[in-house]
C-alpha cells in the first residue's frame, strides 16, 4: 500500500485513507487521536479501543478528505463525492457525481462556507457543506489542474499546468 492522501482531523479523530493499493479495496479509517500501540482491527472488526470506525472501501486514491463540522467529505478519483458522519462513519450520501467522466487528483479546500473541488479538466465544483448534496456552481478554466488549491485573504489560488490563478471577489 502506498499512502498518498494526507490525514485530516476533527472531533478528536484522525482520518486515514489508503491511497494506492494494487487491486485491493481502499479503506478509510477513523483513529482516536489519543490512541497508541497496535490498534489494528481484527479481520471482521470495525472498532477497537483506538479505532472509532473503519470501512474497507471508500478511501480516496490521491485526494485528501476534508472535515467540516460534523462531516467528512471524500472526493474519489473518478469524479464523485461521498460524505460521512465524521464521528460514526455513517454514510450521509455516497458517490454523488461531480460532472461526467471527471478525474480528481487535487484535494478539496473549504472557504466562506463552501467546498471547492477541482477536476483535472479545469472544472471547479462549489459544493455546500452539510447533509444534503448540493452543487452551488461549476466554474471552468481552460487548463489542466492536478495540484491542490490554497486559500488566503479571501482569495483562492490555483496552480494549473501553465498558469497560477488568483480568484477573489
Model-identified regions with their sequence ranges:
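Noncatalytic, solvent-exposed loop/strand surfaces
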Residues: 1-169
Amino acid at each position: 500500500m502506498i499512502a498518498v492522501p494526507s490525514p485530516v482531523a476533527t472531533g478528536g479523530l484522525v482520518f486515514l485513507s489508503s491511497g494506492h493499493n494494487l487491486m485491493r479495496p481502499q479503506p478509510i479509517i477513523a483513529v482516536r487521536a489519543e490512541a497508541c500501540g497496535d490498534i489494528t482491527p481484527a479481520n471482521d472488526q470495525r472498532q477497537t479501543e483506538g479505532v472509532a470506525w473503519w470501512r474497507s472501501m471508500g478511501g480516496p486514491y490521491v485526494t485528501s478528505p476534508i472535515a467540516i463540522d460534523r462531516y467528512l467529505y471524500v472526493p474519489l478519483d473518478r469524479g464523485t463525492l461521498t460524505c460521512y458522519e465524521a464521528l460514526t462513519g455513517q454514510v450521509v450520501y455516497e458517490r454523488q457525481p461531480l460532472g461526467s467522466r471527471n478525474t480528481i487528483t487535487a484535494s478539496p479546500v473549504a472557504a466562506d462556507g463552501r467546498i471547492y473541488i477541482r477536476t483535472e479538466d479545469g472544472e471547479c465544483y462549489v459544493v455546500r457543506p452539510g447533509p444534503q448534496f448540493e452543487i452551488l456552481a461549476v466554474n471552468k478554466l481552460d487548463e489542466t489542474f492536478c495540484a491542490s488549491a490554497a486559500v488566503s485573504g479571501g482569495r483562492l489560488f490555483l496552480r494549473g499546468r501553465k498558469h497560477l490563478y488568483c480568484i477573489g471577489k
